[in-house]
Amino acid sequence: MSNNKVLKLGLPKGSLQDSTLELFANAGFHFSVQSRSYFPSIDDDELEAILIRAQEMGRYVSLGAFDAGLTGKDWIIETDADVVEVADLVYSKASMRPVRWVLAVPESSPIKTVKDLEGKHIATEVVNITKKYLAENGVNASVEFSWGATEVKPPELADAIVEVTETGSSLRANKLRIVETVLQSNTQLIANKAAWADPWKRKKIENMAMLLQGAINAQGKVGLKMNAPKAALDKIMSGIPALRQPTVSDLADKEWVALEVIVSEKIVRTLIPELKRAGAEGIFEYNINKLID
């Protein structure tokens, strides 16, 4: 029977949507999104979710429309959202690393540092962040809000831009050069202050944060199990670059032990043959969805 307690969750629509839903699935929360729907279904009666742009998430969470939500640190700063920052979740639309807001100019531009922006015109989606950055560097320049396609604006429509990038490939494709990093940002789980003060909601949010972080920790990791003769144990263990000391368990045959270890997936193709040569048997690999520290 339902206890009628529900946590209202805001999920980012747009570039972060697919990677966020995949992360939640690995954490054990399976959302289903119908075409053109902003209301995903979820296999948890205690959750209600709505898809909304990350740029607006902080404001709606601070107002109490959502109890919790996921958005970038950049948008929390840009909108001056009064929220509880629960957890750093370092992932983005295409990778498991932070994004950067960078100052960029045409490759042929004489601008070399932020100081060279004095009296210039800058286009960006993060007007407040850019104005603060200029003020901190003692630079007077005009800042215009950009509704999109910011990379195409220099040099005709702007002298420089402040734009978000993961790899820099889009900037290079538009013949732009990065001058400086303005801000590094990653996704954050945030909470409404009143919701955070509610014991049930806080526990629900904290549990979610733990599982999401565990899913991030497990990215690129696999588990290995194997049996090993005690006589070869030192040799086998010395060749395992494990995240932690391997777990060793006795077997019915007193001359053998079972080993279990978590390693980077990248090394498995070279590690398994070496383990076999060192004397390990019955080696098998398994996927890890969550790794809780």
From Swiss-Prot:
Query: What is the designated name of this protein?
Result: ATP phosphoribosyltransferase
Q: What does this protein do?
A: Catalyzes the condensation of ATP and 5-phosphoribose 1-diphosphate to form N'-(5'-phosphoribosyl)-ATP (PR-ATP). Has a crucial role in the pathway because the rate of histidine biosynthesis seems to be controlled primarily by regulation of HisG enzymatic activity.
**What influences the activity of this protein, per its activity regulation comment?**
Feedback inhibited by histidine.
GO terms for cellular component: cytoplasm
Q: Which residues form a coiled coil?
A: none
Q: Which GO terms describe its molecular function?
A: ATP binding; ATP phosphoribosyltransferase activity; magnesium ion binding
Write one Pfam family the protein is assigned to: HisG
What family is it from? Belongs to the ATP phosphoribosyltransferase family. Long subfamily.
> What NCBIfam families does the database record attribute to this sequence?
hisG, HisG_C-term
